[in-house]
């Protein structure tokens, strides 16, 4: 593949949030990036998304205009009981001072649009990435660094990035074996409601009108036992996004279906919703009554992988470490992957150096992403760990006080110093 002088040719599989972030990070280093995605982007997924301080910092480092995200400041996490009681509150008004950026809530489509803009903008830093839709990968030759698509065509590159999500195709070729993403037993109803639809109901003013403004987590008691001895893990997460004009709702619970035969994402009815959350306080049930276009979404976790890298092919984001959404760090970890990859492959990096740099990328990213995934899992499954993220400043500092750009630059400096002294 032809490449610009002192530039690598990069092929990214997946034009989701992680793939676009990787494209931005690599184009900013002067590399020539092509993005391939199996979809046509005719039906983008509408849902809210958490952007904690470490994630917002990384977006700024990639040159994103955060004003375009239409974010809503998450000033407080409020834990509430399913009976209507108010429990612990975690004040987040000092996050900007503590971490350099605030925590915001955004609409996924707004975030995707901004990443797309920065990746493809001809006026941006470095050559603009190019996007190729309706290209589904069927095969990746790791030795030749090529991919083959369903239309029979093959593309080669100096570097291939598998950012193709939790159902990744590239993962199988990196690991040289199939990896099963097991059923978690956890599922969530999710939907969006226009904020002004709440106006006729004063009992819902607490969601977007009354302080403290921020996300609400409405849970059943932490240690009740059901008839089969399983903890009741039902939780409803509510927050505003898109400049406060929309409210995102995610209602998490144990899945009664066989997840191995059920589709990962299916439409659901209001009757389905009330059957699970029928005993929640009337103030919450009123919100459930406003639900429309409900989707039932399986939450699966990619098991710890033996490696993320094989020669000049690497994994990034959910393809490597998809996790539960309990810490709001799923996208953030993929974004950190992208920033690290771009930092470790500056302009002037040669194709012969890629394998060494990717090994360093894996060393830098794998433990942290797996730690966050494990913490996210325990917050959902271990009763005494529920709410730990809100209670533990040490844990929050470890997760949100981390600056991937700074850490990547340190690693690169050490690597270059070692190479120069050899």
Swiss-Prot record:
Q: Mind telling me which residue stretches traverse the membrane in this protein?
A: 6-26
Q: Where is the major localization of this protein? A: membrane
User: Gene3D superfamilies recorded for this chain?
Assistant: FAD/NAD(P)-binding domain
Record pathway: Secondary metabolite biosynthesis
Catalyzed chemical reaction(s): hispidin + NADH + O2 + H(+) = 3-hydroxyhispidin + NAD(+) + H2O; hispidin + NADPH + O2 + H(+) = 3-hydroxyhispidin + NADP(+) + H2O
List locations, semicolon-separated: Membrane
Residues that bind FAD: 50, 108, 318
- Provide a GO CC annotation, any one: membrane
Task: Describe its assembly.
Answer: Monomer.
Q: What does this protein do?
A: Hispidin-3-hydroxylase; part of the gene cluster that mediates the fungal bioluminescence cycle. Hydroxylates hispidin in order to produce the fungal luciferin 3-hydroxyhispidin. The fungal bioluminescence cycle begins with the hispidin synthetase that catalyzes the formation of hispidin which is further hydroxylated by the hispidin-3-hydroxylase, yielding the fungal luciferin 3-hydroxyhispidin. The luciferase then produces an endoperoxide as a high-energy intermediate with decomposition that yields oxyluciferin (also known as caffeoylpyruvate) and light emission.
Q: Which family does it belong to?
A: Belongs to the paxM FAD-dependent monooxygenase family.
This one is known as: Hispidin-3-hydroxylase
């Amino acid at each position: 593949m032809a490449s610009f002088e002192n530039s690598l040719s990069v092929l990214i599989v997946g034009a989701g949030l992680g793939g676009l972030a990787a494209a931005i990070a690599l184009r900013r280093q002067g590399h020539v990036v092509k993005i391939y995605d199996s979809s046509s982007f005719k039906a983008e997924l509408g849902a809210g998304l958490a952007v904690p301080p470490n994630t917002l910092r990384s977006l700024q480092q990639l040159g994103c205009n955060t004003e375009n995200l239409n974010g809503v400041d998450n000033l407080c996490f409020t834990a509430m009981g399913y009976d209507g009681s108010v429990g612990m509150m975690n004040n987040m008004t000092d996050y900007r001072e503590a971490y350099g950026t605030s925590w915001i809530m955004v609409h996924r489509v707004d975030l995707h649009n901004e990443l797309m803009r920065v990746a493809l903008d001809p006026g941006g830093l470095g050559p603009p990435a190019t996007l190729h839709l309706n290209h589904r990968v069927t095969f990746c030759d790791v030795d030749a660094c090529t991919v083959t698509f369903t239309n029979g065509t093959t593309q080669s590159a100096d570097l291939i990035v598998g950012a193709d999500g939790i159902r990744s195709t590239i993962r199988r070729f990196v690991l040289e074996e199939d990896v099963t993403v097991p059923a978690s037993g956890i599922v969530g109803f999710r939907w969006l409601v226009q904020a002004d639809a709440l106006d006729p109901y004063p009992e819902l003013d607490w969601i977007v009108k009354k302080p403290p403004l921020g996300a609400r987590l409405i849970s059943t008691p932490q240690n009740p036992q059901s008839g089969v001895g399983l903890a009741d893990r039902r939780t409803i997460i509510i927050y505003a996004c898109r400049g406060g004009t929309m409210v995102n709702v995610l209602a998490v619970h144990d899945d009664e279906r066989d997840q191995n035969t059920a589709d990962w994402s299916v439409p659901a009815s209001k009757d389905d919703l009330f059957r699970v959350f029928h005993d929640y306080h009337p103030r919450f049930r009123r919100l459930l009554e406003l639900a429309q276009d409900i989707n039932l979404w399986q939450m699966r976790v990619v098991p710890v992988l033996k490696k993320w890298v094989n020669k000049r092919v690497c994994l990034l984001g959910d393809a490597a470490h998809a996790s539960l959404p309990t810490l709001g760090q799923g996208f953030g970890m993929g974004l950190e992957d992208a920033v690290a990859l771009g930092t470790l492959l500056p302009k002037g990096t040669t194709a012969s150096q890629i394998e060494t740099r990717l090994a360093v990328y894996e060393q830098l990213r794998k433990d942290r992403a797996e730690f966050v995934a494990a913490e996210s899992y325990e917050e959902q499954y271990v009763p005494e760990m529920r709410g730990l993220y809100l209670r533990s400043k040490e844990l929050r500092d470890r997760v949100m006080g981390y600056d991937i750009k700074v850490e990547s630059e340190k690693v690169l400096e050490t690597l270059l110093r070692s190479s120069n002294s050899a």
